[in-house]
Every structure is written in structure tokens, then in C-alpha cells.
Amino acid sequence: VATSGGFSGEQTSTDAVALALAATDGASGYAEQTAWAVRDVDPGAVAREAVEIARRTANAGELAPGSYRAVLGPYALGELLQYFAFDTFSGLALLEERSYLSGKLGERRFDEKVSIADDALDPRGLPKRFDFEGVPKQRVPLVEDGVLRGAVWDLPSAARAGGSRQSTGNAPPPAERRWGPLPFAISVAGGEAESVDELVELVDDGIYVTRLHYLGIVEPRQGILTGMTRDGTFRIRNGKLAEPLVNLRFTVAVPDVLADVPGLTRETTLANEAAFYDERYAYGALVPAIATARFDVTGIGGPPGI
């Protein structure tokens, strides 16, 4: 691509994805692996992980609604943050005052362990060199040490904002243009925990969530989302994974989830967020697993499985 703005460049991109869902009556498990090079994907390991989770979900029990301490695995955290980010860290949403950031930029609203960026240049993700308007990509700090720092912009939203505002290279694919600029490369800094087991020990008494689905935005200005857990939800007792749980309905304010974070894993995972329903645009969230002091369960669903 060559633009009148002086940018000239080219990009060749690939992505490889292995998704595994192991399910039978009353049991299910899920795992995935995403990379830009097929050599970095191990379908056999993905399948084994899904099967192991499924084996542990049989005979799932119910859980009373309430506020629980929780560990969210990277698949769960990736999906939760991607939904939150599209409304929160969009420059257009900020201009239209429908973003959680509205009136809060520069304030510490999250735990100081939480730092989030939009970074399409990170080779651990699915790198992109420029956006759909031909603007070069860049790393955009969104949250630093719990402080809300900024949003992403495309050419129209930056022009509307005026002043010295410039596009950050976040124009989305044509099918998504109505939403304005979007952060397609969410990256959360890892923490100090060496394993998920260490996070489970920190939580001590709560729940573990592998994956989410059917997410919906309830109140974007407050960052409230609702959805269901699936394919591997467990009770945490005495710092260990205990009995499996049925699928749970949750309604959370994401800022509450991120406000008190006992820990995050050092290792991050590329959680696949590619759309397979219309125009496909491969992207993902580079995230650790996280321990949170608040995850609000508001109801129960059916058991795992088919």
C-alpha cells in the first residue's frame, strides 16, 4: 500500500488455529492454540487438553448466585476484555460519551498490576503492519499500572476529535466500519505467578472459569457485561481445584473484576478472537490468566456437555 500521507509498505500475513471441544452427555472441555506460523500449533496437545478438562467436568453441581473470588483462564479473560475493549477503548465511543473512559482518563481505576495495550506489532500475536486506511500500526497504551491512559483512533474519529489528535492505525475491516476504530490486538502484561495453580492458591475459596460464551453488553459506560461460563467451570476450595460446576450466568462490571487483582500469570496466551461468521479477520488477545477478588454469579444454566 502507498498513501498520500507518505506511508509505503506491504504485508503478508498468515494464521493457524487449532480448536478442540471434547463433549459428551454431562461433560465438556475446550482448548485452543493460535499462532501466525503453523509450526507453532500442536493440534494433538490441544485435543489432549480439551479431553482432560472434559473428564473433570462430569457430575457437575450447582452454585448459589453471589459474588465470588475467581480465577479466569486466558480464554475467559481474552473474551471478556475484547468485549469490554471494543466499547471502552474506541475513540469514537469516547467522543460519543458511551465509553467507560468518559471523564476518567488519567485516573487509577484498576489494580496497579493491570496494564493493557493495543499492540499489533507484537510478534507473539498476529502482527499487522497497517490498518484498513493505510495508516501504520503502533503500540497504543490503554491502561498503565491501573491508570486509564487512552483510546485507539482511525482517520474519521481523529479528525472529529480535532486538535493534534492523530489516527493510531486502528481502522477496522469494511464490515466493522460502523463501529469506528477498534483495538484488535489487546495485550495484557503478565504478572508474577508462575502457574495457574499459584493463582488458585491465592484465591483459596472461589471458582475457576475456563471459557465464556453468549456475552452481551449491558451498560457500556459502566463496563457491565453478562454471559455464561462453559466447558470447564470448577469450584476452588482450600486453594485447590475441587468439584465441577454447571454452566453459570454471570453479570459483571469489568472494572470491578480488574479493581482487585491478587495475581496474574507470568506467561501469556494468544486467545483466538477471530470471527468465523462473516468477513473473517484473524485477531486475538494476548493475555495471562488472572485472579480476581470479584466475579458476580447471577444464575445457573445447564450441565456441561452436549
Placement of each model-derived feature along the sequence:
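N-terminal small-residue-enriched
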Residues: 1-306
